Amino acid sequence: MQVILLEKIQKLGDLGDLANVKAGYARNFLIPRSKVKPATKTNLAKFKLIKAELQASEAKILKNAQVIESKMTGTVCTIQANAGEEGKLFGSINTSDIQISLAASGFEVEKRNINMPETIHHTGKYEISVDLHTDITVSIKVVIEGFQEA
């Protein structure tokens, strides 16, 4: 199925490109999330009229992501977690915990945009990447400090 991309999608193309995707992927995922429109004659004609508006809004989103990147670069998130004497956590640290820590620092990030290779089970320093935009990824440091309950 041929579709018109309404935003940049990794592995498919940029805003305004025509892409061939499987019909199920388009119907069940891309179209309901307003990422694409079917490439019909009427949709192509309509898209030519609104393409400039979409590009302007995409540029604004990219600029906002760049501003957030400059503020977020070098950010260190410290998370307190209950741990044993050897630094093993009772439980684990996942993307939800990092999202809460970032929100406390003033950065609103969706959980799905935080990239962790795996959950954290030990105290220490970790490097985590956060996707702010399809083109912008920022790396942050996460410090897990353990405490013991009495």
Curated annotation (Swiss-Prot):
InterPro entries from the UniProt entry: Ribosomal_bL9 (IPR000244), Ribosomal_bL9/RNase_H1_N (IPR009027), Ribosomal_bL9_bac/chp (IPR020594), Ribosomal_bL9_C (IPR020069), Ribosomal_bL9_C_sf (IPR036791), Ribosomal_bL9_N (IPR020070), Ribosomal_bL9_N_sf (IPR036935)
UniProt keyword Transferase, yes or no: no
Keywords: Ribonucleoprotein, Ribosomal protein, RNA-binding, rRNA-binding
Source organism, top-level taxon: Bacteria
One BP annotation, GO: translation
One Pfam family, short name: Ribosomal_L9_C
A single Gene Ontology CC term: ribonucleoprotein complex
GO function terms (MF aspect): rRNA binding; structural constituent of ribosome
HAMAP family: Ribosomal_bL9
Job description of the protein: Binds to the 23S rRNA.
Family: Belongs to the bacterial ribosomal protein bL9 family.
UniProt protein name: Large ribosomal subunit protein bL9
Organism: Ruthia magnifica subsp. Calyptogena magnifica
